[in-house]
Amino acid sequence: MVAPVLKSFQAEVVALSKRSREAEAAFLSVYKQLIEAPDPVPSFEVARTLDDRLQRPSFDPSGQRLQDVHIAWKRCPEPPSAREQNEGTCPTGHTPANGNHLPGPEDTLVTDTLLQKNEAERQKGLQEVHITLAARLGEAEEKIKVLHSALKATQTELLELRRKYDEEAASKADEVGLIMTNLEKANQRAEAAQREVESLREQLASVNSSIRLACCSPQGPSGEKVSFALCSGPRLEAALASKDREILRLLKDAQQLRHSLQELEEVSANQIADLERQLAAKSEAIEKLQEKLEAQADYEEIKTELSILRAMKLASSTCSLPQTLAKPDDPLLVAKDVFFPTQKFLLEKPALLASPEEDPSEDDSIKGSLGTEPPYPPQLPPPPGPEDPLSPSPAQPLLGPSLGPDGPRTFSLSPFPSLAPGERLAGDSLLSKHMMGPAAFKGETGNLLAFPPTFYGGAKPPSAPAASVPCPEPTGAPEAVDGAGPEEEQLDTAEIAFQVKEQLLKHNIGQRVFGHYVLGLSQGSVSEILARPKPWRKLTVKGKEPFIKMKQFLSDEQNVLALRTIQVRQRGSITPRIRTPETGSDDAIKSILEQAKKEIESQKGGESKNSPASVSIPNGTASSSTSEDAIKNILEQARREMQAQQQALLEMESGPRGRSVPPSPPERPSPATASQNGALTCVKQEDGGGGSGSSSTVQAPLAVLSPAAFVQRIIRKVKSEIGDAGYFDHHWASDRGLLSRPYASVSPSLSSSSSYSGQPNGRAWPRGDEATIAPEDEAAMGEDEAPRVGELKAEAGAPEVGGGRLPYYPAYVPRTLKPTVPPLTPEQYELYMYREVDTLELTRQVKEKLAKNGICQRIFGEKVLGLSQGSVSDMLSRPKPWSKLTQKGREPFIRMQLWLSDQLGQGQGQAPTQQPSASQASPTEPTSSPSPPPSPTEPEKTSQEPLGLSLESSKENQQPEGRASSSLGGKPFSSSQAAGGIQEMVAMSPELDTYSITKRVKEVLTDNNLGQRLFGESILGLTQGSVSDLLSRPKPWHKLSLKGREPFVRMQLWLSDPHNVEKLRDMKKLEKKAYLKRRYGLIGTGSDSESPAAHSECPSPCLQPQELSLMQAKKPRVVLAPAEKEALRKAYQLEPYPSQQTIELLSFQLNLKTNTVINWFHNYRSRMRREMLVEGTQDDPDFDPSGGPNVLTPGHTHREPTPQSPDSETEDQKPPMKSLELQEPEGPLQRAAPDRALVKIKQEEGLEVDGDSQPQDVGDPDRGQDGPKEEHTHPLGNSDLSELAPGPFLSGTPNPDCPSLHNPQEKGTGEQVHSEPLSFKSTSESSCCSLEGPPNSPSVISSPDLTTCVSPAPSSSAPISPSLPGAPPAKVPSTSPTGDTAAALHPSTKVNPNLQRRHEKMANLNSIIYRLERAANREEVLEWEF
């Protein structure tokens, strides 16, 4: 192979060498030519010499040169021309001499000319030579260049060819080397193969030889081989014969095995066929069973309905006969057993929820009684039954229902199952308190008892009544216990935290679930508490609560198991309890229905006067498997039932009120007997038949109500009918009434329930809509003052119940408001989850953006990350590296990236930034920067109050419409101007001394006891934190941007306003009023309008344009119509943290901006939180037991838990001012129409439901919606207060500030007698006055009295509660009727966990019912809810 290649290369090399030789030869020839070419140098030299010689003659004077030339020419033959010339020049005829011709002048001339010609010719020749030489030289040079380039090209070619040759030679050499190595290997392999062949041959030979040997030597019996050669023929034959025999035997064996194999195959085939037949038969059976199951899919519903029906029947039978309640009802127990399994989870969850929220004392007591009785397992309730026949009996069903909403309570179906009613009450202060409260509340009617059990989840109705009378004393104990319980013992916080962590680890319960259901805290807070528990002595009262709850949680294994169940069921989705599944799917509706049924059953389990109605309703539901049909059946039946009941109730209300009910006097010893009896009757009707009573009020106007309102009312009525409507409804109604107003939108169902229960609450006009309705009924009732008293009592009772609700919200709302953010989309996950992120840089950017936009970490955590402030702070300060984060741990960082890039959507992207303004803006104009100077004049204050109100309410978008419009009315146009104006002022302002300004501002604020929050919100439009920062660390003027200078300009303007302090105080009052109004419905919109200071409606008139403009400097406030607010509230019920889609839908349907909707939700949530806080502080009513459970000691009247009202600050705690100013209006109003007053009061309460925004709806139908406002502005507000805080104001002891307000009767009895609506109004008015009074207004608002009215009242069953005097107000910690307890009451301001639980239950049930109605009216839903 190589040879030919080498030859070809050789040929190429030879050719190349030839070409190179040729090139060299050509080059040499060129060189030779050049060398041979004549040298131009000598010719040049000759030319030069000639030139020299020519030039010489001209310089030679001697003529020598001429002679030489002449001689030279002489030598040369003379040219003819010369001769001719010579001849011509001698015309004379002289002939030259023969030999010598001497030159003459002519000759010289001739020679000169000749010489010159010759020279010229020579020079020409020389030039030509030069030219030719130059041309030849150039050509030669060009040739040389060409030859050089050719030489170079050939050399490069040669080098290239050599290189290629070398490469190819190398490659060929490599190939040859490879071939040689392969050849060597092949040779080696061939050698190995040969060796193998040889070895194989040897083996073959050995094998052959061995075979031969084997053949030759068959084995003998001994196995010895005989050599073949030695074998004889006969032996070989014998061996062969033996082999043949062996072969035959083996063949036989093989045949037998084949036969057995065939048999086995046949048998197995038969067996397989049999099994297949059996399988087919069983699959058919399974299909049939599945069909049956599908056909009986509603079995659970039917079962639960049947259990409810049984419970209701028992309850209805037992309602009239408390004795029956005392005896365990086997059927009821059975029903409950049946009911509980289905409800187990429901119960467990509420129980958990409730238990965490209970006070330690209450928790202990309740848990002891309820929690310990395995609350969660359905079976557990029965044991309580045996212990306490009462509890198992209808009470249990009631509790069961209550369980749904309030787990723990429910579980201990009988609050004191193990103890005798008396023992238990005494033993469990809280329980007794609650149980007694309810028991007392209903003790008289017996129906009510059913209610308390529902609420108290374990109160024995029968014993409760009995106990309720003794209750007074237990109440005192409970209160004391309530106050002291937590402090009684020093807890080892480290040990408790350790045990809790152990339990959580052991049962795989997440801290989030534990915090959500047990402590009511976020995961971050729980983690902090468990990781670093502080010593008990260093904890505040609030700080001790989690440890008390943890201790109670650890006290019963059932709590842990229940929580584990919740963790398992809710793994991964803890949402606010009020969140509901989307209405879209039938499954969701079904689940809502089932939950609602269970909740209703559990809540109303035993006591419904309208049990038949409720029964029919459940049946309807069961019968129609489709959720909508079921709901509609329920609603239809409820409507029919209620209409019938309404008629009866109306008659009863007019007539029964006339009858005096003996129990009522015990309940309200102080009320006038006649009015008392009537009132009691009303109360009982409302309580015992409360459902019907309140429902009647509601129902009268059913036709007038919107579909939503109607459905809600019906559902409430159904609930009331199912359970002891009166008790339940009242409880709810009062709770709702009190809270729903404040929470106007907490849930339509809540408010509506309040509406139906409005009457018990004294808010016959439970809601705006209901209010209108209720007034009619009440108008009729109003005819009798006794009825009014009854209503008042109902209100009081309701307040008691309602009060419970307040706490409910505190416990409930926080969790409801727990940050929930929409989940990340799969695209977002994919985009960011696996992309490496620098968490340090990301958190730095987030912190910068938060700081730049003034967004607090709490809001950022809630809106963007779905985390608590603690978690956000921890994450931003110490971010883990991305690689160390789990998928869950990366989510917050993904959300941060999305937020930074504005990809989270308006809801989250904007919310955080806007929230600060909204949330920070607080009640005063958040965005409209109340002008610095705007410190409003009184009217301005009013306006500002409206501002504050509207701002605050705008936060919740619930400002009363009148106010909103008024406050806005003045400001809207000016706000834009104002914004421009303040900015111009800032731009043109001379340099200010920021330090001195802030110093003066601090001095003014401290001297006048004004809070930074109020100042910031009303004057600067900033949050308290921003104001504190500005005042403590003011930057120099030159370092501030225009925006940063604005607050200092505003401060300067405010300092220059002579009325700045008064305006701020007025604003504070207005703000408090607004807060009260919104929060507790204490001040009706009307009341605000009526009070001069409250004239938020004429804010603009009094405001100076500049102030107005300043106040509006930021943005005009958005005023929402009542319908819009209602729709937003309903949407909030369904989705407190709406998704972007929901926000857009709402904005589209309501024709609002998305920012407006977002801000409304944010503000409303903030308001809910504040209210919850206030409720928490207010949960302990200060009632004077001596005055009656409802009576607050005068001292307590103005207890000032300033913290309770968000607006109250240090300034809030001023000596109460006399609130008699309002008495005048009260008096006239009362005189004018006591009946109306009541109606209006109820209306107002109804209004409260709607919040500030819809007062008009509440008016008497006759009057028109505006009537209540106008007529009862004050009374309404006051009435609200009185209703809310009947204790303080209605208490037997007259209000010190408003002595005239109390009836002599009240004073005498020491009870708040509501016999006179006037007195009631006056009390309420007095409360209003006190509210108005700046000193007390905050305190009043937050004061337990108000609280009482607001939350304590309900809790204590407010002074008005129908509960027996002995019965401790449900809420009053010190239930002892004696005045001594009043003092005790005073100290204990803790939230009553029982009330909280009640509220939670109510909220749960309300939300479920609300969802239910939503599902029922899905077609109409779009108009009013989302």
Swiss-Prot record:
Its main location: nucleus. GO terms for biological process: negative regulation of DNA-templated transcription; negative regulation of transcription by RNA polymerase II; positive regulation of dendrite morphogenesis; positive regulation of dendritic spine morphogenesis; positive regulation of excitatory postsynaptic potential; positive regulation of gene expression; positive regulation of synapse assembly; short-term memory. Residues 1233-1245, 1260-1274 have a biased composition (Basic and acidic residues). The keyword Phosphoprotein applies. The keyword ATP-binding does not apply. Keywords: Coiled coil, DNA-binding, Homeobox, Nucleus, Phosphoprotein, Repeat, Transcription, Transcription regulation. The modification Phosphoserine is found at S81. Disruption phenotype: Knockout mice show moderately but consistently bigger brains than wild-type animals. Cell density and thickness of upper cortical layers (II-IV) are increased, while there are no differences in neuronal density in layers V and VI. Neurons in layer II-III show simpler morphologies, with a significant decrease in the dendritic length and the number of branches, as well as a severe reduction of dendritic spines density associated with synaptic defects. The working memory is impaired. It comes from the Eukaryota. GO terms for cellular component: nucleus. Signal peptide: none annotated. PANTHER family: CCAAT DISPLACEMENT PROTEIN-RELATED, HOMEOBOX PROTEIN CUT-LIKE 2. Belongs to the CUT homeobox family. This is Homeobox protein cut-like 2. It comes from Mus musculus (Mouse).
